[in-house]
Amino acid sequence: MKINHLDAFSDNYIWTMESEGKIAIVDPGDAKPVHEYIKKTGYVLTDVLITHHHWDHTGGLEEVIAEYGCSAYGPSGGHIKGVTNPLQDNENFHILDYYEFRAFSAPGHTNDQLSYFCDMTEKPILFSGDTLFYAGCGRLFEGTPGDMLFSMDRYKELPPSTLVYCGHEYTESNLKFAMAVEPHNQDILQSMKQVQEARSINKPSLPSKIDTEFKINPF
C-alpha cells in the first residue's frame, strides 16, 4: 500500500491509500481534489473513511459517493450523510479488498471521533483525524478533558512504530507550544528543525510516529 496526501482548504489533508489500481481516501472535506487526482491517476475509488462529522472532513462525501459508488465507513448514529457502513468501537473492516482496519472510539475533539488502525502494512498505520496531532491534540469542541485523556491512553497502547496520519498541518504551531512547555527537550528542537525543512519545500510534516509522540507531545 502507498499512502499519499491531497491538500484541501488551508491546512486539511485528505489521505489516500493506493494499491493495485485501487484507492481509498480519508476525510474528503472537499470533493474537487479527489476528482482531480482520480482523473489524473485513473485509480478506482473503492472506500472512504470518515473520522468525525465536522464539515471540513465530510463536506465532499456525498458528492464522492454519488460519483464513484464506493463504500463509506464512519461513526454510527446516522448523523453523517453519505456513510454507508457505520462502525462501532473496536469494529474491524476491510478496504481495497484486502487490508483489515480496526475502528476505535477516540473522543475529545468530538464525541463521535473514530481513529483507524491497520497493522497489515510495512509499518502499522493510524489515521487519527483531529484527536491526535503531531506534537499536539485536538481542540475540545464536544468532549471533556477526561475524554481526551481516555483517547491518549488508547494511542499509548499502539505499537511504537505506528505511523500517525492526522487531519491537519498544525505541526509547527504545536511544536512551538511544546517548546514553551519543555524548552530543553532536544527531541522537540530536532523535530522543529525537521518540520521546518519539510514545510520550506511544501512537503507535509506528517506522518509522525507513536514513539515520537511519547518524546515530544506535551499531552
Identify the role of each PLM range.
Residues 17, 27, 52, 64, ...:
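Divalent metal-coordination and catalytic microenvironments
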Residues 136-162:
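Active-site-adjacent loop/tail segments of enzyme domains
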Residues 23, 30-105, 124, 194:
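Active-site HxH/HxHxD metal-binding segment of metal-dependent hydrolases
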Residues 28-30, 53, 77-78, 109-110, ...:
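Active-site metal-binding loops of divalent metal-dependent hydrolases
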Residues 15-18, 92-121, 125, 157:
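Core dinuclear metal-dependent hydrolase active-site scaffold
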Residues 153-163, 172-219:
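Accessory terminal helices/loops
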